[in-house]
Amino acid sequence: MKIDNLTKDIIQWMINYHHESKRESWIIGVSGGIDSAVATSLAVRTNIPTLGIVMPMSTSNHADVIFINRAFHLLNTIRQNYRITCQTIPIQPIIESYQKCGVGLSFIYNENNTFSSYRPIREGNLRSRIRANILYDIACEYCGLVVGTGNKDEDEIGYFTKGGDGLVDICPLSDLHKSTVYKLAEYLDVPQEIIQASPSAGLWDNQTDQQELGMSYDEIEWALDYDDTVTMQKYLGPYQQNVLLKVREMRRKNKHKLCYPPIFKLTREKGGLR
């Protein structure tokens, strides 16, 4: 499908869903990343009131400042042709209040108070969930729908935080590979500094998606589209086999993120419950 037609289809689909929902606005977290930039660019083109929420850890941390600058560059670019309201909410004070209660700690200590391990993913997940809480609080105030920013490669393997960035009302990019998101970004005039930046969730300092996943998005796309009936796995090279196994294992392990929780069902037998 041509990118211009795809763009029109997504925008019309978003408009239709919004009208059916009887809501009044879009609420979206603007991170400075490419998926967020594309989702925001699509939302404003629906001509439905859009609120872009920038939620850095702080306004003094160097890594956060880079993301903030990208986010505001995007918002300033969008404002040249479209309407969007912006709000900045640093989340560091909220995180610190959690950590004072022993929640969301990255540094783990033994009973004798000696250092045990460093688990940045724990604090990273907390950051993501705090941001989701903020977005839904604002959505409540403005009668809005929270726009998801996940793409197919991330969502299919469960590379998102349950109750965090995975908690949304509409997913305009979730059936699009990352490679297609990049094409949309070019078509939608997303700033080049965002397009050229290494993909990162920004959940801890110097984090990149490829480093955390151990594979690139192109490799994930290949694995998701791989058809055993066309090329048997035994004919793949060791590296390809490893990527394929890794992607399939992530899908298996994160299956609980991709569906509703299982529900115990009462059965009826001879007019009664069993």
Region spans (language model):
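Short, structured secondary-structure boundary patches
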Residues: 48-50, 71-76, 108-111, 167-172, ...
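Low-complexity, flexible helical/coil segments
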Residues: 63-66, 88-96, 130, 180-189, ...
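Peripheral terminal appendages
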Residues: 1-30, 34, 38-42, 46, ...
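Short, basic, helix/turn surface patches
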Residues: 76-86, 115, 120, 173-182, ...
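Catalytic subdomain that performs nucleotidyl-dependent activation
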Residues: 118-131, 144-216
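ATP-dependent adenylation/nucleotidyltransferase module used to activate substrates
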Residues: 1-156
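Predominant activation on well-ordered alpha-helical scaffold segments within soluble catalytic domains
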Residues: 40, 69, 136, 179-182, ...
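Alpha-helix boundary/capping residues
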Residues: 75, 101, 163, 188, ...
